[in-house]
Amino acid sequence: MLKAVLERTIGSKSKRDLKDYLPTLRNINKLERWALLLSDEDFSKETEKLKDELKSGNSLESILERAFTLSREAARRRLKERPYDVQIIAGLALHKGKIIEMKTGEGKTLSSVQAAYLNSLTGDGVIIVTVNDYLAERDSNWMKPVFDLLGVSVGVVLSNMDYELRKAQYAKDITYVTNNELGFDYLRDNMRYDLNEKSLRKFNYCIIDEIDSILIDEARTPLIISGPTEGNTNAYLEVNSLVSFLKECSKDSKTGDYPLEIDDLDGDYTVDEKAKRISFTAKGLNNLEQLLVSKGIISGSMYTDSNFNYVHYMTQALKAHLLFLKNREYIVGDSGVEIVDEFTGRVLTGRRYSDGLHQAIEAKEGVRVANENKTMATITFQNLFRMFNKISGMTGTADTEAKEFHRIYNLDVVVVPTNRLLARIDEDDTIYYTEEFKFNAITDEVYKTYKKGQPVLVGTVSIEKSEILSAMFKSRGIKHEVLNAKNHSREAFIIAEAGAKHAVTIATNMAGRGTDIKLGGNIEHRVRKKIGTNVSLEEFQEAVKNEREDYLKDYNEVKSLGGLYVIGSERHESRRIDNQLRGRSGRQGDPGRSRFYVSLEDDLMRLFAGDNLRSLMGKLGMATGEPITHSLLTKSLINAQKRVEDRNFEIRKHLLEYDDVITKQRDFIYAQRNSILEDTAIKDRILIALEEYLTFLLEGAKSSTVSNVFLNEVNLIFAYMLEGLGSIENINSLDLKAKLMQIAKANLDEKENSIGRDLFNGFLRYEYLRNIDSKFQEHLANLDSLREAVYLRSYANKNPITEYKEEGFLIFSELIKDIKVSTIRRVLQLKLDSNSSNFKSVKKSKNVNSIHKELSGIVINENKSVSNVQVVRSSPKIGRNEPCYCGSGKKYKNCHGKS
């Protein structure tokens, strides 16, 4: 209430920001005459002048107006597009570190040019993040002529580039890259064994396109780099055959809820569709154990170490069957099970669900079950982008999430007014009792509109729903196109024609499509259809000029029919996704219309609003099969969406609290790695670490004599090197420490002399980094297990996040100690063979996958170099189940132990 009163009195924060930019806008407009008189050659000279001013101590604010004026004129000359005043305002907001909300077709891409150019002048680099490779490449090529004229370099990072090319692209003044590639490059850089192989430079300023998609929709799914592990893939096939033997608990027929008392649960498991969780009852666990034993899958108790994983396998199998549906969450293609992005409807090529879920789905669908992966490095987008000195973003729909942007990222949203008034008519929702009645009504409405000639875009939430509607349209003789994950290769063609007369398009989620639907169709696409692609640029431009008259005729005809009619076949969980669908109509002042058709059987209604709406519809006198349209119902739907959005916000906030623990630890580990990569005297670092560890052990002793703990640790570290010291139990502890340090120094000096200082330093660096990486990977797995364990402590009235922080700190302290001790032990106990005079460069390769959890996949090769040192073992033999000495990450018996 207070917020509403304040906004009426002094205006919203967004409106106040807009007013603050007006004086600067007026000054930029006045400077246009100066820019018009410049020759093309003058632009790069002016850029150098601005850079010199910054070097002499001036601020970005002091050169802002000239920089914006130059970039505006450069766009006019190279793109034949002069940025509107609203686009200049958007650029100012981006420079100030705000999120701009601009409607579809208002020119977000061009708005970013001014802010990117200004901030690139510091020489620290600007990164522009997009949601896919296509948009990164398109936007960089589109804006390159502008940046070239201004004399600043522009690059693009694509998924198929190697690290050398990536490094060159990141070194440019302005770099376009996807959020996934940027995140994986950060993780990969912190797994390198050579400083020269790092591709990124220090994070400075970042502009995020479709910022709501990246920082909100994808915030629940961390990026993960993973490697293969020895998993029991056959177990997923075994438990898949048991799904039908287990029964879900009965629900109350009126409320649709399970009984509150545990004793009243009559089945084996419960299903939480909202949280996508399966929970076994005590009875269910007993039945599962009996099934596993009777089928010969296990012998003995299910609760032994070797058998307990079957509870996890069975849980994932039930999830796969009950919560993850074909043609909704995934499709089965030539590559097996492929995940469909719930927000964009695109296939997420190469990605896999984590934690065995993908294997469970593969078993369900009867395709080859691949091995599980282990986490090697991970980060969330939230913490990735919080590392930048300044971030800003662009989207067509951010205002609904303004609270979250401010609370999590300290980013304010500025709603930029449209250049022309919005002419689209947004109708109230039409609501039906059943999905069947709803689909029939949509088909009738589309048929009427199709016959009239008005283009229609029908948005669906899944492939399954798009195919149902497609079949119904076909039976009515409605010619149409379907855009979903199964035929995404035709996306450009389908979108180009979606605004033409009589066009009917069914699309699964239009979020992040990145292409405007133009009334009358796309003129460039029309020309390409007529003259083909094998023509010169001049011939193409001439053909476009000749086609313009016919195109304008078609444009005006479609405009007179009412423009693009957008029909939503279902409300999405997020209002933003609905607004993005609506936003495809009414671009740049064009007419348009939108309406959502909803049924009480839709997922959103069933899970979050069903009972309330049923009651309200009864009061409004609605009969089964009859539609009803009322502002109260639309408000009720929006309130249901708000509840889901609030719930999802809490999930993202919760994830961030846990990830903040990992972030502090990851930052420490990565700082250690960087320090070691730069260190030219790692021998001294190891000796210091040894002395600190021996001191730590002695501090725990109660007398001047050595303790058993001290003796055990010393024997583990020094092994054969203690020969000749006699009985060390009787030596004074301080004297023993001094002798041990002498032995260690002599040991390392001898090895250094045998192969040379530089080569030895490289060997030590490799060993130190290898130990850091392998131990940190184990640590990440331990944190995963800890997180699951503390979740259950909430039942004992304990705060899970507090427990996680406290215990996470303890195991991290152990990790730091383990890294040092295992490194010291290894470098001391290995003898280097100095007989080989030719130490060639060796590459340490690992197969690792880049994963977006719950998604995963994309196999990449990490090459980690270190000079070749022949190693001869003369200390205790490696156990068959210990990690192999080569650093492959495999057990010794499965690697060099085979031979």
From Swiss-Prot:
Its EC number is 7.4.2.8. May bind 1 zinc ion per subunit. GO terms for cellular component: cell envelope Sec protein transport complex; cytosol; plasma membrane. One of its GO terms (biological process) is intracellular protein transmembrane transport. ATP binds at residues 87, 105-109, 516. GO terms for molecular function: ATP binding; metal ion binding; protein-exporting ATPase activity. The keyword NADP does not apply. Keywords: ATP-binding, Cell inner membrane, Cell membrane, Cytoplasm, Membrane, Metal-binding, Nucleotide-binding, Protein transport, Translocase, Translocation, Transport, Zinc. PROSITE patterns: SECA, SECA_MOTOR_DEAD. Its cofactor is Zn(2+). SMART domains: SecA_DEAD, SecA_PP_bind. The keyword Hydrolase does not apply. Zn(2+) binds at residues 884, 886, 895-896. Belongs to the SecA family. Monomer and homodimer. Part of the essential Sec protein translocation apparatus which comprises SecA, SecYEG and auxiliary proteins SecDF. Other proteins may also be involved. This is Protein translocase subunit SecA. It comes from Borreliella afzelii (strain PKo) (Borrelia afzelii). The gene is secA.
